[in-house]
């Protein structure tokens, strides 16, 4: 996942 467009996804993981 790209940390720029979807920073929320990284937080969930």
From Swiss-Prot:
One of its GO terms (biological process) is innate immune response. It is found in: Secreted. One of its GO terms (molecular function) is toxin activity. Keywords: Amidation, Antibiotic, Antimicrobial, Fungicide, G-protein coupled receptor impairing toxin, Immunity, Innate immunity, Mast cell degranulation, Secreted, Toxin. It comes from the Eukaryota. The modification Leucine amide is found at residue 13. Its main location: secreted. Disulfide bonds: none annotated. One of its GO terms (cellular component) is extracellular region. Expressed by the venom gland. Mast cell degranulating peptide. Shows antimicrobial activity against the Gram-negative bacteria E.coli ATCC 25922 (MIC=30 ug/ml), the Gram-positive bacteria S.aureus ATCC 2592 (MIC=10 ug/ml) and the fungus C.albicans ATCC 2002 (MIC=25 ug/ml). Has little hemolytic activity. Its mast cell degranulation activity may be related to the activation of G-protein coupled receptors in mast cells as well as interaction with other proteins located in cell endosomal membranes in the mast cells. Belongs to the MCD family. Crabrolin subfamily. This is Vespid chemotactic peptide 5f.
């Amino acid at each position: 996942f790209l940390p720029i467009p979807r920073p929320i996804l990284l937080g969930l993981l």
